[in-house]
From Swiss-Prot:
Belongs to the multicopper oxidase family. It comes from Kluyveromyces lactis (strain ATCC 8585 / CBS 2359 / DSM 70799 / NBRC 1267 / NRRL Y-1140 / WM37). It is an enzyme of class 1 (oxidoreductase). Glycans are attached at N31, N81, N92, N117, N199, N203, N249, N270, N297, N364, N413. Residues 1-25 form the signal peptide. Keywords: Cell membrane, Copper, Glycoprotein, Ion transport, Iron, Iron transport, Membrane, Metal-binding, Oxidoreductase, Repeat, Signal, Transmembrane, Transmembrane helix, Transport. This is Iron transport multicopper oxidase FET3. Residues 586-630 are cytoplasmic. Its main location: membrane. Residues 26-564 are extracellular. Cu cation 4 binds at H418, C489, H494.
Length: 631
């Protein structure tokens, strides 16, 4: 039999290449147990933090694209559930490993263990991981993740440094939650942090070599405040944002919201005679109040001479000179996605419900978690999975068709900035309007499809982006990753308030894909926490359109007056009228004073003075008590 080398050699090369790829791919296995320990993060105050195997901080990870990650996460807490999310990874084909509780998994009960097992097939760059339960990452349950490309990076550097930024609270999240989601905080004012930290400390020292190019991977792992970041007398060249390599863009300052990542190149000077300040600054426009003892800046040290003096803090002429990421261009120049097949328009509002607590809303709905994780509803609902109703009336669920171009128009009617994150995708930011100010008669300004800025030919792409106050953003992405994907504000306080929605992408394909099926471990985790892994948002498996018993948001404050309000107003008015009558009646009555009272008022001895007729004094209100001569 004659073998055609024309077909055989390419096949052999493909086989060898595939074998080499498999051979080079590694499996990274981690066994982590959560717990509590005391730690003084900023050098000023010791407080409980969440530990990993009794240690703090949590480990920073570095893997290569194509590698497999296996994390056995054991819940070592006594009194709370937990979960884990790898922020920015697409989890293509492994949606159940994404991590947000009640979205793609049941929460992990105390004493239970869940295996996160996935291959990083289509991501490289700078990422991070964190708990997706109750703001636990604000208590320290988080770390960075660097995914190296299979080939070389599209830029040169000598050394790599990971820089983790965050704000820090002295109270733990449980305490802050009780004060925040409370009738005594009706405006929804977010808790004010006590400090800015960098790499889980304050006033970090970074020893550098002269004439060296450093790659800084900068991650804001905080839960609230955006930060300005700059290094005294050093430019930064941006080369990557959120796992997307971009054309080089040089700046002196970055503006980094929570959950965003920037990779920058910094080339050090030849002169080692001076050390330089590394600066962080709160975006104080996000703070409702600024306490007198809050330091808005934090200074760390870039040391050319480790024995030299540490630098003083560095000032800038304007805080507005930061890089605008809207104008970054992806290195692979992905063209603007064509006109969308489906546009989702959502309006952001912050308001109070009937219980007096302040909530956040998309289109007048505040996200309320279902009784069954949404992914499990999508997998068990059959053809009903195409009906958004099965996912609940308070989850803001949208069902997407495979490979459609999706557009999200987000109108921010709030007076603050919001960083929004989309799980499972990177998106194009095709429009972001400037912020508007009610104080000068502006805003809010919703997006106008007939009157907007020209869309860029090659829009910036990332997975976390901010919207300005009382303004709008427009995002586009391709629905090419079947799964249930969370879209939410990454300010943890706003997520607690319900600023989130769900995108259920090609559920029928998920049902027919082997890698998307629940593992036995997933099912056991649900059973151990007392939850079902089948059913609609109400837990109903007989009729997926029957939502009786589902979780719903607190009732709205009713229009007009309730019966109690009418009664209260009636008696208040009656009390007011009676009060006016009393004032009028007693105010018009003459109040006679005795002679002795008048004399004592004048500071005289009653026994030493001649008795006089005081009727004239009592009858003349304007008379001075010293106007009569008493002899």
């Amino acid at each position: 039999m004659k073998v055609s080398t024309h077909h055989f050699l390419p096949s052999l090369l493909v086989a060898l290449w595939s074998w080499a790829t498999v051979a080079q791919a590694a499996t990274h296995t981690f066994n982590w147990t959560t717990g509590w320990g005391n730690y003084n993060v900023d050098g000023n105050f010791e407080r409980p933090v969440i530990t990993c195997n009794g240690e703090f901080p949590w480990p920073d990870l570095k893997v290569k694209r194509g590698d497999r990650i296996q994390v056995y996460l054991t819940n070592g807490f006594d009194d709370r559930n937990t979960s884990l999310h790898f922020h920015g990874l697409s989890q293509n084909g492994t949606n159940m490993m994404d991590g947000p509780e009640m979205i793609t998994q049941c929460p992990i009960a105390p004493g239970d263990t869940m295996l996160y097992n996935f291959t990083i097939d289509d991501n490289d760059g700078t990422y991070w991981y964190h708990s997706h339960t109750g703001g636990q990452y604000q208590d320290g349950m988080k770390g960075t993740l660097v995914v190296e490309p299979e080939d070389s990076l599209p830029f040169d550097y000598d050394e790599e440094v990971v820089v983790q930024l965050a704000e820090w609270y002295y109270d733990n999240v449980d305490t802050l939650d009780r004060k925040f989601m409370n009738v005594y905080n009706p405006t929804g004012a977010e808790p004010i942090p006590q400090n800015l930290i960098i790499n889980n400390t304050r006033n970090m020292t970074w020893n550098v070599e002269p004439d060296t190019t450093y790659l800084l991977r900068i991650v804001n792992t905080g839960g609230f405040v955006s930060q300005y970041f700059w290094i005294e007398d050093h430019d930064m060249t941006v080369v990557e944002v959120d796992g997307v390599y971009v054309e080089k863009n040089t700046t002196s300052m970055l503006y980094i919201t929570v959950a965003q990542r920037y990779s920058v190149l910094i080339h050090t000077k030849n002169d080692t005679s001076k050390n330089y300040a590394i600066m962080q600054k709160f975006d104080d426009t996000m703070l409702d109040v600024i306490p007198n003892d809050l330091m808005l800046n934090a200074t760390s040290y870039m040391m050319y001479d480790k024995d030299g003096e540490k630098p003083e803090q560095s000032y800038v002429d304007s805080i507005d000179d930061f890089l605008d990421d809207f104008y970054l261009t992806p290195l692979d120049k992905v063209e603007l996605y064509e006109d969308p097949d489906y546009t989702i328009t959502v309006d952001v509002v912050m308001d109070n419900l009937k219980n007096g607590v302040n909530y956040a809303f998309f289109n007048n709905l505040t996200f309320t978690a279902p009784k069954v994780p949404t992914l499990m509803t999508a997998l068990s609902a059959g053809k009903d999975a195409l009906n958004p109703l099965v996912y609940g009336t308070n989850t803001n669920a949208f069902v997407l068709k495979k490979d459609e171009i999706i557009e999200i128009v987000l109108n921010n009617n709030d007076t603050g900035k919001h960083p929004f994150h989309l799980h499972g995708h990177i998106f194009q930011l095709v429009d972001r309007e400037r912020g508007y100010d009610d104080a000068i008669g502006e805003g809010p300004h919703p997006f106008d499809p007939e009157d907007h800025n020209p869309f860029p030919d090659y829009p910036m792409m990332r997975d976390t982006v901010y919207v300005n106050p009382q303004s709008s953003i427009v995002l586009r992405f391709k629905a090419d990753n079947p799964g249930v994907w969370f879209f939410h504000c990454h300010i943890e306080w706003h997520l607690k308030q319900g600023l989130a929605l769900l995108l259920i992408e090609a559920p029928e394909e998920m049902q027919n894909t082997e890698s998307q099926q629940l593992t036995d471990n997933h099912k056991q985790v649900c059973e151990n926490v007392g939850l079902s892994w089948e059913g609609n948002a109400a837990g109903n498996t007989n009729d997926f359109l029957d939502l009786v018993g589902q979780n719903v948001q607190v009732a709205n404050i009713p229009d007009g007056f309730t019966a109690k309000g009418i009664v209260a107003m009636t008696f208040s008015c009656l009390a007011g009228v009676l009060g006016l009558i009393s004032l009028s009646t007693y105010g018009l009555m003459g109040v006679k004073k005795s002679e002795e009272e008048i004399i004592r008022d004048l500071g005289m001895d009653p026994d030493a003075v001649e008795k006089v007729d005081v009727s004239d004094i009592n009858s003349d209100e304007d008379s001075s008590r010293t106007s009569k001569n008493i002899e």
